[in-house]
Structure formats: C-alpha cells, structure tokens
C-alpha cells in the first residue's frame, strides 16, 4: 500500500512541467488571450499608489535623512517625505523660504540651509516644524532673524548674514534654546535690543564675533556658560555688563580694543574658568584674578601690559587658590620676563603652563 502511494506521488511530480523563466512579453500574451490589452495593464500599474514616500528628484534619501545639497536648487523641493528628520539643503541657490515649503514635515529635527542666497523668510514658513531642534541659516543674505521660530528650537546658527537688528520679540517663548550663533554680521550695539536674549531660560552658548558691537550686550541670561565676543570693537569691560552671569565658565573677548577691565567685573562671574583677553589694548593685568576661585586659563598676550605685580594672579603669601592655573599667556607685551618675580606664578599648576616670551 505504501509503495502504491509513493508511486502516485512521484508520478504527480513527473507530470509537472519544468520551471520556465517568464518575461513581460509572456504576461502580455496571456493578457491578450484573456482580452486584457497591454495598455490596460500599463494604466493599472500607473494607478497604483506608491509603496512609500518618494525621494525628491536628484536628492538622496536614506533612513529619514533627505540630502539635497549642492544641486543648484533655487527653491525648496516639493513632496518631501513626511517622515524626514533631517533635511540638508545647503550649498544651493535658494532665495526665499515660503509658507508651505515645509508642510507635513512634523517629524523634522534638523534643517540645514547654509550657503544659499536666502534674503526672505515668510513669517509662517517654520510653523509646521513642531519638532525642529536645529536651524542652520548661516552664509545667506538675511537682514533680520526669522519670526515665529518653533518653540522646540535648541540651536540657531545665522552667522555670515546681513543682520543689523536683534529684537527681543523674536526669541519670545523659545525656552528650549541652548545655542545662538550670530557672528560675522554687520551688527552694532544699538541694533541689539536690551534684554533680547533674556527670555531664553536654558541658553548656554552665545557667539557674536566679528561684528561692530562696542559693548557687551546688556541683559544676558544667567544660564550662560559660554560667551564669545571675539573680533568686535569693544573698548571696555564694566562690572554691570557681567552682572548676574553666575554660571559663566568661558568668556572670549580676544581681538577687541579693550583698554580696561573695571574692578569687580570678574567677581560677577564666580564660576569663570577661562578668560580670553589677548590681542587688546590692556595696560595692566585685570583686577580680581587673585581672588577668583575657579579661573584656570588666562590669555593676555598681545596687549600693552608693561608691569606684572607679584599678587596679580595668586592670593597674597602662599594661600592656595581653589583651582590652580593650567594656562597663562603674557608674551608679546612690553613687560620683560626677567622683571616678573618668580613667586608671581606660585599658584600655577606647572611651569610649562606659563607663556612669557619677548615683546616685539
């Protein structure tokens, strides 16, 4: 009985025809025999919905990242995949951002528009971007900061534009903002509204370098840990300008025209660790360094300092600082290194951390 069953199974297999590779022409012949023409089949295929989001022409899409950089685009591409989390449009020729350019991009976290020709952004252009965290608009032709930026924004970079005004209203409600980069713009001190940055409660980093400002912007938020104002036209550091910056750890004021630092200025930054005052017009070491508990790095090279006192950097006698210096630079000043008492740097961590050199 078993043998009979096996024989029948083998016979059934042997009756089956061999596998044949079939092409589009074979299916078209079948359609012709069944009364379905090739045109009907083509229309049927065209009517099918796409299986997933379509990548814009010439762009590259991978893992919710849409890269459309370096394509010579003059506008934002249409029909961007709605699940996009990062959109890269840098190095194009886009001149304007319009309402609706980013519709349906509710999952976008980062938008890169660097190095375009953008001079206009419609007030509601970024409204659909309810999850946007990073907005990069550097190297464009913007004269003002964009309005109605998403409240989720954490990082804004708009250096190398044509911005002349920073209004307080632009940053209202941006409570998640951490980084603001405004360098290399034709900004003047009068163009920054008093307290423009005050409303951003989490703001940690501001860079306004290589502009025309002559004073430290007033009303900076107490949350700041880094303030970079290098390459400006600041002439003086007064105590009021640093008041309330209790969390500031790094202050960059290199390449300005600062001739004086008011007494008490550094006392307003009790947690300062790095102070960059090189390439200015200082005639003496700023007061208050010896009493500062945490400061570790002080750059004073390329100034007009002609004398250094034995207590300018360290507490009197051999009282120890909370933190020892790890870097002190005084080279390219009129003061001669042999005129400085060895005990002046008694609170420096290692001697190699001191850079004196000669004045040229």
Swiss-Prot record:
InterPro entries the record matches: Leu-rich_rpt, Leu-rich_rpt_typical-subtyp, LRR_dom_sf, LRRNT, SLRP, SLRP_I_decor/aspor/byglycan
Principal subcellular localisation of the protein: secreted
Keywords: Disulfide bond, Extracellular matrix, Glycoprotein, Leucine-rich repeat, Proteoglycan, Repeat, Secreted, Signal
Record's subcellular location: Secreted, Extracellular space, Extracellular matrix; Secreted
Sites carrying sugar chains: 34, 212, 263, 304
Propeptide: 17-30
Record protein name field: Decorin
Protein source organism: Equus caballus
Gene encoding the protein: DCN
